[in-house]
C-alpha cells in the first residue's frame, strides 16, 4: 500500500539551458543526458537533492540510490518519474512510485546507474522492492514432497 508520508513536496532548481551530465550504464558505457535541474526536498529535518534528467518544461526522470539499495530494493538503484514542475518550481516527489529498472528483471537490459549526486543517505522505504524471480525463490529451490508407495 502507498504511504502518504512518502509524497513529498520538492522544489525544482533549474540549471543553465543545455546542461548535461554524464551517466554510466550497468555495462560501463558513459553517455551525456540532458540535466535541466535538480529537485530539492526535505525529510526528517534534512535537505536532499536529486539531479534530474529530461527537458526543462516536461516530466522529470530521476535515477537514484538510497540506503535500501541492496537491502530491500534493487542494488543498482531505482527510477522515478515526476510531473513537470509548476510555474513556481514546485514538484511532488511520490516515492511510492519509485520502480526497479529493467535490468532488475533481465540481464539483457542496459540501465543507467545513479550518478554520485543521486546516492542518498536516506532509507526510502516506499516504492518497488527487490524482485525475486520465482525460479530463485526458496519455495522453488526446496524439494517437493512426494507420496510414498507401500
Question: Residue locations for each model-derived region?
Answer:
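Surface-exposed beta-loop interaction hotspot
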Residues: 1-30
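Residues that flank catalytic or metal-binding motifs in active/ligand-binding sites
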Residues: 4, 37, 58, 76, ...
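Generic beta-strand structural signal
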Residues: 4-6, 60, 89-91
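Well-ordered beta-sheet/strand-loop patches within structured domains
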Residues: 12, 42-45, 54, 85, ...
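Beta-strand elements of well-folded, non-transmembrane domains
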Residues: 12-14, 43-45, 66, 97-99
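Mid-length scaffold segments of soluble, non-membrane domains
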Residues: 23-75
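Extended, aromatic/histidine-rich regions of cofactor-dependent oxidoreductases associated
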Residues: 67-72, 81-85, 90-92, 96-150
Amino acid at each position: 500500500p502507498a504511504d502518504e508520508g512518502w509524497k513529498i513536496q520538492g522544489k525544482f532548481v533549474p540549471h543553465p539551458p543545455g546542461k548535461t551530465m554524464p551517466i554510466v550504464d550497468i555495462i560501463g558505457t558513459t553517455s551525456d543526458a540532458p540535466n535541466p535541474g535538480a529537485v530539492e526536498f526535505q525529510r526528517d529535518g534534512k535537505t536532499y537533492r536529486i539531479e534530474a534528467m529530461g527537458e526543462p518544461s516536461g516530466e522529470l526522470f530521476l535515477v537514484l540510490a538510497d540506503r535500501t539499495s541492496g537491502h530491500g530494493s534493487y542494488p543498482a538503484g531505482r527510477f522515478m518519474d515526476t510531473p513537470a514542475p509548476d510555474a513556481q518550481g514546485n514538484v511532488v516527489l511520490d516515492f511510492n512510485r519509485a520502480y526497479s529498472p529493467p535490468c532488475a528483471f533481465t540481464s539483457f537490459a542496459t540501465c543507467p546507474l545513479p550518478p554520485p549526486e543521486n546516492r542518498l543517505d536516506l532509507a526510502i522505504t516506499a516504492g518497488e522492492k527487490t524482485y525475486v524471480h520465482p525460479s530463485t525463490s526458496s519455495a522453488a529451490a526446496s524439494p517437493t514432497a512426494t507420496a510414498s508407495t507401500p
